[in-house]
Swiss-Prot record:
It holds the Pfam family GTP_EFTU. GTP binds at residues 17-24, 88-92, 142-145. It comes from Erwinia tasmaniensis (strain DSM 17950 / CFBP 7177 / CIP 109463 / NCPPB 4357 / Et1/99). Disulfide bonds: none annotated. The gene is fusA. CDD domains: EF-G, EFG_III, EFG_mtEFG1_IV, EFG_mtEFG_C, EFG_mtEFG_II. InterPro entries: EFG_II (IPR041095), EFG_III (IPR009022), EFG_III/V (IPR035647), EFG_IV (IPR047872), EFG_V (IPR035649), EFG_V-like (IPR000640), EFTu-like_2 (IPR004161), G_TR_CS (IPR031157). This is Elongation factor G. The keyword Cytoplasm applies. The lineage of its organism: Bacteria, Pseudomonadati, Pseudomonadota, Gammaproteobacteria, Enterobacterales. Transmembrane segments: none annotated.
Length: 702
């Protein structure tokens, strides 16, 4: 089958924003104008096409980034049809992982800002992620019809808060209830959308007289910005020559692709104004797959030889799985982005990350939650495969005869864990199945069984993250669960060496007795090593060879639950150097018990301590809140390591015990009016101060 749309006419874009900037409404309008959607779904009615999970409709926030394909030929049908693949991304901080993964597979992004709220905290986080993946972007200032809307104020915030270089290509005509349309600063015309057909048609008009001067000023700003694209244009501009519309657009496009400027558009998605022109800007200024740098990877040749794949049908097939979703009708849907080559349904592909081949059964293109089955996908396409068994997020799919592993995505370690148990015994198996499914969909979510308590533990990126997962278990798998309090994983160890500690197990009660006797030395090992070492220094057969493994085993069993508070014991070395035995009464069991008695006695004498997990915490905050943030980290027993300037404020680096970090997201939000963001990851185990250790030991003893 030949390609229906040339790859130069593809646009793979994300629509990204803070929680209430009106991103879902904006996406809905895009689907409407591109002719995909015939009835406009309103978020307030819970009927928006993109927000297809039940919780999203209730909470009115977007959780899963749905990928949708649409076609656009321009507001005035001025282009050939372009294929626009849209990935809708969530705006809540606990779902940052979703934003991160969609940024990884996009070529460009539209940042939606609220004309009233401006650049809000999550906008800053999303901005940093887009910077990390060098995603070219344009901005859409939405909600121009709302009380307090101010387009130019938002433009200046993009400059001050995001340290970006915003270049408006439009101005708003009026604001609040007087918002009627926009001025196109390239054409220097006013655009007026017809309300009778929900803005499908429009007229170009003269710029209102009272805006003439302002429009001229911003037109000059735009032309100057375009002229900076090349020396040639700059000379022409400085020589007083007019730049043509085509020259301006070409130059601005070049600067967007180089991440030098952010073009800013505006409108009110709700009032059907502006989205149409923003779509034109997507086509005119955002990159096609052929405009972005080739994707890097490594060959599967044992030497990790670097390799690249270009956006070209002729190159070997290579794709990246960026999302797994469970569909009630077809099971697993694996969303993937094709970087190079062509693949047909029915083909076998290689997953080099898992060293497995899989057959691509059916391939579907998604329109929000509707599906269209297709026979093949080519470079630049975003589609979903049905029935891939072992693919997880971040895996590569490629041609089995040209194996390449594309750059993997990085997923943070979960930072909060809670115990969950099904409300009824009958749900136990269903819960295991549900948690397995959810963990496969979401790489930032982990599940394991606590060996001591037998409880199922789930861990994730934040409290809302875990709430939603528990909620999904109930809705999608009909499993109701009780959820425990967040927990910290402590450890126990010793600080001193003790010698010649005895352990004797002797029992005589008629018939055959039991006898085992060991003498050990015990001392600390360096952290980060094997965690446990056993040395057999028995000479002269004071303990027969066959009982030595039983001594080792007896000690290892004690390591699982330490004498202090029942937490695992780490970093100790045990030397067995003497003992005695009885020809008849000695047995493996007797020596195992003798060893455990010796261990307990030695552990108590060797200055036992409790270790707590310490996290590496980075807080990015506007400078005004710096003092509050540092004071708060100090109160949490944090050790400030350093500070540095960033484009949006300051970054504070600190080491903070995990037990002090519960509820931090909420506290940080209220301290900084939601303008700071933080990340944390596990750093090391360190000795807990006496008062903390005592409190933990007492709580465990209850």
């Amino acid at each position: 089958m030949a390609r229906t749309t040339p790859i130069t006419r593809y646009r793979n874009i994300g629509i990204s924003a803070h929680i209430d900037a009106g991103k879902t409404t904006t996406t809905e309008r895009i689907l409407f104008y591109t002719g995909v959607n015939h009835k406009i779904g309103e978020v307030h009615d819970g009927a928006a096409t993109m927000d297809w999970m039940a919780q999203e409709q209730e909470r009115g926030i977007t959780i899963t980034s749905a990928a949708t394909t649409a076609f656009w030929s321009g507001m005035a049908k001025q282009f050939e049809p372009h294929r626009v693949n849209i990935i809708d991304t969530p705006g809540h901080v606990d779902f940052t992982i979703e934003v991160e993964r969609s940024m990884r597979v996009l070529d460009g992004a539209v940042m939606v800002y609220c004309a009233v709220g401006g650049v809000q905290p999550q906008s800053e986080t999303v901005w940093r992620q887009a910077n990390k993946y060098k995603v070219p972007r344009i901005a859409f200032v939405n909600k121009m019809d709302r009380m307090g809307a101010n387009f130019l104020k938002v433009v200046s915030q993009i400059k001050s808060r995001l340290a970006a270089n915003p270049v408006p290509i439009q101005l708003a005509i009026g604001a609040e209830e007087k918002f009627t349309g926009v001025v196109d600063l390239v054409k220097m015309k006013a655009i007026n959308w017809n309300e009778a057909d929900a803005g499908v048609t429009f007229e170009y008009e003269e710029i209102p007289a009272d805006m003439q001067e302002l429009a001229e000023e911003w037109h000059q700003n735009l032309v100057e910005s375009a002229a900076e694209a090349s020396e040639e244009l700059m000379e022409k501009y400085l020589g007083g020559e007019e730049l043509t519309e085509e020259e301006i657009k070409k130059a601005l496009r070049q600067r967007v692709l180089n991440n030098e400027v952010i073009l800013v558009t505006c409108g009110s998605a709700f009032k059907n104004k502006g989205v149409q022109a923003m779509l034109d800007a997507v086509i005119e200024y955002l990159p096609a797959p052929t405009d972005v740098t080739a994707i890097n990877g490594i060959l599967d040749d044992g030497k990790d030889t670097p390799a690249v794949r270009h956006s070209d049908d002729k190159e070997p097939f290579a794709a990246l799985a960026f999302k797994i979703a469970t569909d009630p009708f077809v099971g697993n849907l694996t969303f993937f982005r094709v970087y190079s080559g062509v693949v047909n349904s029915g083909d076998t592909v290689m997953n080099p990350v898992k060293s497995q081949r899989e057959r691509l059964g059916r391939i579907v293109q998604m329109h929000a939650n509707k599906r269209e089955e297709i026979k093949e996908v080519r470079a630049g396409d975003i589609a979903a495969a049905i029935g891939l068994k072992d693919v997880t997020t971040g895996d590569t799919l490629c041609d089995p005869s040209n194996v390449i592993i594309l750059e993997r995505m990085e997923f943070p370690e979960p930072v909060i864990s809670v115990a969950v148990e099904p409300k009824t015994k009958a749900d136990q198996e269903k819960m295991g199945l549900a948690l397995g499914r959810l963990a496969k969909e979401d790489p930032s979510f982990r599940v394991w069984t606590d060996e001591e308590s037998g409880q199922t533990i789930i861990a994730g990126m934040g409290e809302l993250h875990l709430d939603i997962l528990v909620d999904r278990m109930k809705r999608e798998f009909n499993v109701e669960a009780n959820v425990g309090k967040p927990q910290v994983a402590y450890r126990e160890t010793i600080r001193e060496t003790v010698k010649d500690v005895e352990g004797k197990h002797a029992k005589q009660s008629g018939g055959r007795g039991q006898f085992g006797h060991v003498v050990i030395d015990m001392g600390p090992l360096e952290a980060g090593g094997p965690g446990y070492e056993f040395v057999n220094d028995i000479v002269g057969g004071s303990i027969p060879k066959e009982f030595i493994p039983a001594v080792d085993k007896g000690i290892q069993e004690q390591l699982k639950s330490g004498p202090l508070a029942g937490y695992p014991v780490v970093d100790i070395k045990v030397r067995l150097h003497y003992g005695s035995y009885h020809d008849v009464d000695s047995s493996e069991l007797a020596f195992k018990l003798a060893a455990s008695l010796a261990f307990k006695s030695a552990f108590g004498k060797a200055k036992p301590v409790l270790l707590e997990p310490v996290m590496k915490v980075e807080v990015e905050t506007p400078e005004d809140y710096m003092g509050d943030v540092i004071g708060d980290l100090n109160r949490r027993r944090g050790m400030i390591e350093g500070m540095e300037d960033t484009s949006t404020g300051k970054t504070v680096r600190a080491q903070v015990p995990l037990s002090e970090m519960f509820g931090y997201a909420t506290d940080l939000r209220s301290q900084t009016q939601g303008r700071a963001s933080y990340s944390m990851e596990f750093l090391k185990y360190a000795e807990a101060p006496n008062n903390v250790a005592q409190a933990v030991i007492e709580a465990r003893g209850k």
